[in-house]
A protein has these predicted regions:
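Sequence signature of WD/YWTD-type beta-propeller architectures
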Residues: 1-292
Length: 292
């Protein structure tokens, strides 16, 4: 989804739980390859904003649009009254010409630290409130990505690493929880490993977490499951069972961005292809942010 008034194409969509609204981030993304590092590749944003899409009206607008704040990975709370996301602040970009900004981000990628944020949403007016820091990761020289709230609204699950936000490439990345009732933040020790944990999701009843991990060989992500009990405690993770167990050993591809469903998917890959590529494109209209 594109519009000249939006930074770039929209990614990381999250549907409102009841209304025909979608929040995205709009990201200018690039990658660099390491020559002398334990990591293989670094994926990073040169810029990113949050955008809101009204499906029925076919209207898109910016939620937050700043030069120095990189907002990404938005998700709605289960009641639809709040959006969670992550944000890194790079004040130096405010004084740099556009020609130097990408180079600055490349040279300082290890100093990009994303906090977990939230912002209130008023359904009646379609307006957003003031951003609030949920987890101050930057003060600990850490960086968060992919916040997701449990279906009961009690727990905020996110990935925490040393820097950046594309943690599927970071061995330091682990799963963390914030108890939104008590405010306590803690790692999922029974689910984490010495290697990468990154993208994740909740089951519809909030009792299971599915996530990607590179604990097996350090190169390919596999899907793991961890039971999350009513007391807010995770249990020992195990790899997703396959009809052929060797599938998890021999597959030279990575699983990515898991989503759990209550029912089997009834559409084929060809059905999705027709919807994505077979229909005529329609321009999306841009509307000024109501907050401005």
């Amino acid at each position: 989804m594109k519009n000249d008034s939006v930074l770039s194409s929209t990614v990381y969509p999250s549907w409102h739980p009841r209304l025909p609204y979608v929040v995205f981030s709009s990201n200018k993304t690039g990658q660099v390859f390491h020559m002398l590092d334990t990591e293989k590749i670094e994926v990073l944003d040169w810029a990113s904003d949050l955008v809101f899409y009204d499906v029925k009206r076919n209207v898109i607008r910016n939620i937050l649009q700043t030069q120095s704040d990189f907002e990404t990975f938005p998700c709605w709370s289960p009641d639809g009254k709040k959006v969670y996301y992550t944000c890194a602040t790079v004040k130096e970009l405010e004084s740099l010409p556009d020609s130097l900004k990408i180079g600055f981000v490349k040279m300082n990628y290890r100093n990009l630290h994303y906090n977990v944020m939230s912002i209130d949403f008023d359904e009646k007016t379609q307006t957003f409130g003031t951003p609030v820091v949920e987890v101050d990761c930057a003060s600990q020289n850490k960086s968060a990505s992919v916040p997701r709230v449990s279906p009961d609204g009690r727990y905020l699950l996110f990935t925490l690493g040393d820097f950046g936000q594309f943690h599927i490439w970071h061995r330091s990345a682990d799963l963390y929880i914030k108890d939104l009732k008590s405010g306590k933040v803690f790692p999922l020790t029974q689910a984490n490993s010495k290697d990468t944990e990154s993208f994740h999701c909740w089951s519809s009843n909030g009792r299971w977490i599915a996530f990607t991990s590179r604990r097996d060989d350090g190169s390919f992500t596999r899907l793991y499951l961890s039971y999350f009990d009513k007391e807010g405690k995770e249990h020992k993770a195990f790899i997703m069972p396959q009809q052929d167990p060797m599938q998890n050993v021999l597959l030279l591809k990575s699983y990515n961005v898991p989503e759990m469903t209550r029912d089997a998917v009834t559409y084929s890959a060809e059905d999705f292809k027709k919807v994505i590529y077979g229909k005529e494109e329609h321009a999306v209209k841009y509307e000024q942010n109501n907050n401005q």
